[in-house]
């Protein structure tokens, strides 16, 4: 019987053991747990809370356990309810009774909280790195397509001409905000709960700062009740992940649409597409579709954790065991999505000629023609109505703006002159020459800014 059940007269029911164990999933915290235990043991020895000999024996034993786990020789025993007890149990086997001194001045409550803080902190770092890689892929494509124009859309209807670079850099900006959010989340996870005990602190002269420094934390928790029971930092990571995955889902939707035969704006590389079991001609954008579908998993992780936390009184409750599966699944899903998307964007082939064809038949210059009339002295509202009627006429005649005669233009306003034919895609793009606009000069500046952002982040592009 586990020493934790020494107060009870009989062992836990077998079903209860299976129901309450977390080892099948929290084994992933073994690195964080061993790192925390090593720092704790070292501090206990330094503070003479345990002997220097026991401290060193514990540290050596933990090092051996880490090697066993990473080489696959460690035996995960099902009777051990979590990774923390599995490691401690093996430590007893390796060094004997000295292992019992490791848990001095520590509870699993602050132990687990510290492990999860470390995991989230490290995951924020890896997530940011993966976002940077995807940003680099988007930037490369944007650089290559500074002269490629396509329709910009509202309501998925052709609206105004934009440069493909401008479109791709929109996602760069979304991802840049994601990096900022994960950087903030990392700050909130960079707080060490260890030393809080079960809930009220511990009656030992701990050197919490020493442990924090060894573990790489820049701050220690200030309230033991809060420290063992808060999971705000997990919620913040999950919330940030949901927003980031949503951005990927939006890009997924566009890759699905743009790669269809009706659009054919992009061809996805064979390595990132699949075929059909019955239709030989198919080249399906499954990676983009799955990324879009997996967004629900990430949202689900956030909703799960919010629900876990919503009714918990201070301080620790076993409900908090339910923080790990949604956290792990979310981290895996987002991490994989970012990695696969970086490869898919890097290898995608965009089709400028198809985009140009779409521009030619969408009346994308309607706003520019209205602006032309404004330049001639007409109010914009009046110009809007004139051009709306002009568009209806052009559609009825099955003509583009460029195919209308000057006489036809002048049926709608005498302000139209021969210079109306100077209003074209190039002039429309050049006219948006202000910060944030799609003009080529602005795109060049935006690309330079994006390069600077990545360079300052240490990303080679």
Curated annotation (Swiss-Prot):
It catalyses: 2-(N(omega)-L-arginino)succinate = fumarate + L-arginine. It is found in: Cytoplasm. Its EC number is 4.3.2.1. It is an enzyme of class 4 (lyase). CDD domains: Argininosuccinate_lyase. GO terms for molecular function: argininosuccinate lyase activity. Gene3D superfamilies: Fumarase/aspartase (C-terminal domain), Fumarase/aspartase (Central domain), Fumarase/aspartase (N-terminal domain). The keyword Kinase does not apply. Its main location: cytoplasm. The keyword GTP-binding does not apply. GO terms for biological process: arginine biosynthetic process via ornithine; L-arginine biosynthetic process. Pathway: Amino-acid biosynthesis; L-arginine biosynthesis; L-arginine from L-ornithine and carbamoyl phosphate: step 3/3. PROSITE patterns: FUMARATE_LYASES. One of its GO terms (cellular component) is cytosol. Pfam families: ASL_C2 (PF14698), Lyase_1 (PF00206). Keywords: Amino-acid biosynthesis, Arginine biosynthesis, Cytoplasm, Lyase. HAMAP family: Arg_succ_lyase. NCBIfam families: argH. Belongs to the lyase 1 family. Argininosuccinate lyase subfamily. This is Argininosuccinate lyase.
